[in-house]
Amino acid sequence: ISTSKLCVSYTIWKVGDYDASLGTMLLETGGTIGQADSSWFKIVQSSQFGYNLLYCPVTSTMSCPFSLDDQFCLKVGVVHQNGKRRLALVNGNPLECLFKQVQ
């Protein structure tokens, strides 16, 4: 399925099923707002100018995706699949993002 076609209709990210060939889970479009098990992400500052994207699934009724405690969150990074770069959950080397204020 072409990602460009999915982005036209679906704009909510989610974590897909485990991909054994990559050893991780890829990010996909087609999520649902408020879907606690696969669509809760947050942005955290990683350096003076950079930010990381974290996937923070709710594991119990006591957990909250907006909490300051990131111990239950997983990092989002880049993996290579069939010559293409894909966003995925990673153990190390998270993708560092920079944001520029639009004027």
From Swiss-Prot:
<dbReference type="InterPro" id="IPR011065">
    <property type="entry name" value="Kunitz_inhibitor_STI-like_sf"/>
</dbReference>
<dbReference type="GO" id="GO:0005773">
    <property type="term" value="C:vacuole"/>
</dbReference>
<feature type="disulfide bond">
    <location>
        <begin position="56"/>
        <end position="73"/>
    </location>
</feature>
<keyword id="KW-0926">Vacuole</keyword>
<dbReference type="InterPro" id="IPR002160">
    <property type="entry name" value="Prot_inh_Kunz-lg"/>
</dbReference>
<comment type="function">
    <text>Inhibitor of serine protease. May protect the plant by inhibiting proteases of invading organisms.</text>
</comment>
<comment type="similarity">
    <text>Belongs to the protease inhibitor I3 (leguminous Kunitz-type inhibitor) family.</text>
</comment>
<dbReference type="GO" id="GO:0004867">
    <property type="term" value="F:serine-type endopeptidase inhibitor activity"/>
</dbReference>
<keyword id="KW-1015">Disulfide bond</keyword>
<keyword id="KW-0646">Protease inhibitor</keyword>
<protein>
    <recommendedName>
        <fullName>Serine protease inhibitor 4</fullName>
    </recommendedName>
</protein>
<keyword id="KW-0722">Serine protease inhibitor</keyword>
<feature type="site" description="Reactive bond for chymotrypsin">
    <location>
        <begin position="25"/>
        <end position="26"/>
    </location>
</feature>
<dbReference type="Pfam" id="PF00197">
    <property type="entry name" value="Kunitz_legume"/>
</dbReference>
